[in-house]
Amino acid sequence: MLLRPLYSLFLLTLGASQLTACAQASDKTPAAIVPPGAGKLPWLRNLLDSSAVLRPHTVALVLADATTGEPLFAQNETKYFAPASNMKLFSLYAGLKLLPDSLPSLRYFSRGDTLFFQGTGDPTFLHGDVPSRRAFEFLQKAPGLLANCDIACSTSYGPGWPWDDFGYYFQPERGAFPIYGHTVRFYAQPPVGNVSSRLRVLPKSFASLTGPVPAALRTPGIDKDTHVIRALDENRFYVVAPFNKKWIDEVPFRTSRAFTLRLLGDTLRRPLVGAPWHPRATDVVRTLRGLPVDSLYRRMLRVSDNFLAEQLLLMASTTVGLHDSLSTQRVIRYVRRKYLGALPYPVAWADGSGLSRQNLVTPRTLEALLLQLHKEVPEPRLLSLLAAGGQQGTLRKRYHDAAGPWVWGKTGSLANNTNLSGYLRTKSGRLLAFTFLNNNHVADSGDVRNEMERVLRQVRARL
């Protein structure tokens, strides 16, 4: 009879001890982890939260000391954003890691009286803005027969690129042996005195493919700034603008193996044949070097040249794995695994230019990349590659100061997305790495850029 009261007393004691243990465990529950910099600079957080322009959409801003890496401020730093052309910073890093001091223009070997040559993705062959004549003169002066050898290459367009941008200058097709930047340039000259108006087409071989726009293509939907349009699936160009004033337009052309051979032969003004790339053990394969790499990096970053960024990854892929193809995805996988494994968050990396909306990155990851670039590249060289506020590139009309540039960065724009990542020199002399991302805004992009500048000017003045 005594066992039941004793058993009941035991259960009560055990229950009390468990309640005490639970209460103690509850007291020891760790506080939520606060990201570094999240609680700092309340004036800056208030500036962002109170902005009528920025408040309706998703905004991220991250600041860190570029030299020490000290976190200074962070808002939405762990969320994923579409970075647009900020992805070119990843392409730059890939090039810095994989390419030598000069670009690989082409690979070649000689056998008998024939020079066999193959593209490496070098975009500078007679390019309109970063032209190199090294490969052109090498091929033009080579004795004997020229045999161009094809090589497998990534698709003309990257994953997620908008198909209806095929006719705009900023989306040329990718390729193994680019010529003229894969674009045609049109120069309209208005009538002067007794000289009638005229249209100059470069390369000249495209003049015969250019004509007036048919009535069926003259639709109200054509942009008022459009001068020349191209047929979707062929190299037919139609002029839609009058010649009553001077204008210049640039339109991508369709690429193909046969068209490249014909255009290259016309350009070199000598016979050219296609052939397979089959070097023998006794053949010595060499690489012809072209322009210094910084000439490409500078143009790519300053004016945000998508074509150069895409071709940069194709060139970099010649240093990774076998030499049997040019592959954007191969070099992305390699760089991500070998050099970017320590990034705080994984990167969804789809292309070299940022044209694809499949690219996704967190602000904290972009900040880590900026800090890594500053650590590995001498500061004067690094800043010289980027657009500079008030001076050149995509920032030339913003961030002015009579004393000189104080913002160096890479802009990034897609419809409804406006971004900027780079470096900022404060009035105290401190260099900051920053990422300022704006996604899914319906406000005019100019208004968003104005507000970004207003915020960054406060950062410059107060830090």
Write out the residue ranges for each language-model feature.
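Small-residue-rich helix-loop
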Residues: 72-74, 288, 313-463
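Coil residues (strongly favoring Ser/Thr
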Residues: 50, 102, 113-114, 123, ...
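A small/polar active-site loop signature that marks catalytic segments
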Residues: 214-381
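Short, well-structured active-site flanking segments
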Residues: 97-112, 274, 379-383
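Mid-domain, small-residue-enriched loop/turn segments at the edges of structured enzyme/sensor domains
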Residues: 58, 107-187, 191-197, 272-273, ...
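Bacterial Sec-dependent N-terminal signal peptides
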Residues: 1-35
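Beta-lactamase-like hydrolase cores
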Residues: 25-80, 99-102, 138-143
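Active-site SXXK
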Residues: 69, 83-100, 177, 263-268, ...
